[in-house]
Regions:
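Membrane-topology and secretion signals of cell-surface/extracellular proteins
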Residues: 27, 31, 126, 134-136
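Short, well-ordered alpha-helix to beta-strand connector turns
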Residues: 37, 85-86, 113, 133-135
Length: 167
């Protein structure tokens, strides 16, 4: 039995205004998290829970997967990393050698502890303070390939989920 993984979308867009890009990132991540048994957290987003009721989108079955996550207490709006997220892991195509972890070793961690996987939104990815804070850095491709945010949102939970099925 594995512990729970949380996909943490870190807002590196505008921290003051609630943009369409924020809404679409949540709408894209919710069905992926639902499908692959991940929690979803948004960090440093300029919104409240009520704002999420107004996400009208054709992505994610019109928001039904986000609603499912909310109803099951598997969606979090946070301004800092919560202890229940477990081990903080930054997802990056340029992992620091001393913090580098493979996808397989990430799954092995999940046998004993929950993990929180940060994904940076926007062109700049995760800021240096988050990279320093994280215990590990995961390059999901293991090849240094930089993935577009939406691609990473899909690939990371999928890879972790399917690898966990092979142990």
């Amino acid at each position: 039995m594995y512990k729970r993984a949380t996909l943490i979308l870190y807002n590196s867009y505008d921290k003051k205004r609630w943009h369409e890009a924020h809404k679409r990132a949540i709408a894209r991540a919710a069905p992926v998290c639902y499908a692959y048994d991940f929690n979803l957290a948004i960090m440093d987003f300029p919104c409240k829970k009520e704002d999420l009721n107004n996400i009208n989108t054709t992505i994610g079955n019109e928001g039904s997967y986000l609603k499912e996550l909310i109803d099951k207490n598997r969606f979090f709006i946070v301004d800092k990393f919560l202890p229940q997220f477990g081990i903080p892991i930054a997802t990056t195509s340029k992992p620091e050698k001393s913090k580098e972890i493979t996808p397989i070793d990430t799954v092995k961690l999940l046998k004993n502890r929950p993990i929180g996987l940060f994904v940076g939104l926007g062109r700049h990815g995760l800021p240096k303070d988050i990279l320093r804070f994280c215990k590990y850095h995961l390059d999901i491709t293991e090849k240094g390939v930089s993935l577009e945010t939406c691609t990473a949102i899909g690939i990371i939970p999928s890879t972790i989920y399917w690898l966990s099925k092979s142990f």
